[in-house]
Amino acid sequence: MASKASGGSTRNGRDSISKRLGVKRYDGQVVRAGNILVRQRGTKIYPGKNVGMGKDYTLFALIDGKVKFETSKGKKVVSVYPVET
């Protein structure tokens, strides 16, 4: 016979790693082409002028310029405008 009752298996004790989602470059920041602006699940924020969208809904700059967050038709949109020198 067992001298000790077997320990019950725990139901908790696990946690998923964070995915580091969110805005990576903010309004007014200067960015280079290819810089990631937003990492997101689904289109919380839509791509505007000079912004591309990856298959995982990541928004990235297509040109060098300044980031601008706007609303268009009730949707949040992020655009990149060239900086005048």
Curated annotation (Swiss-Prot):
Domain of life assignment: Bacteria
Any one Gene Ontology BP term: translation
SUPFAM superfamilies: Ribosomal L27 protein-like
Coiled-coil stretches: none
InterPro entries (UniProt xref): Ribosomal_bL27, Ribosomal_bL27_CS
PANTHER family, sorted: LARGE RIBOSOMAL SUBUNIT PROTEIN BL27M, RIBOSOMAL PROTEIN L27
Family as reported in the entry's similarity comment: Belongs to the bacterial ribosomal protein bL27 family.
Name under which the protein is recorded: Large ribosomal subunit protein bL27
Taxonomic lineage: Bacteria, Pseudomonadati, Aquificota, Aquificia, Aquificales
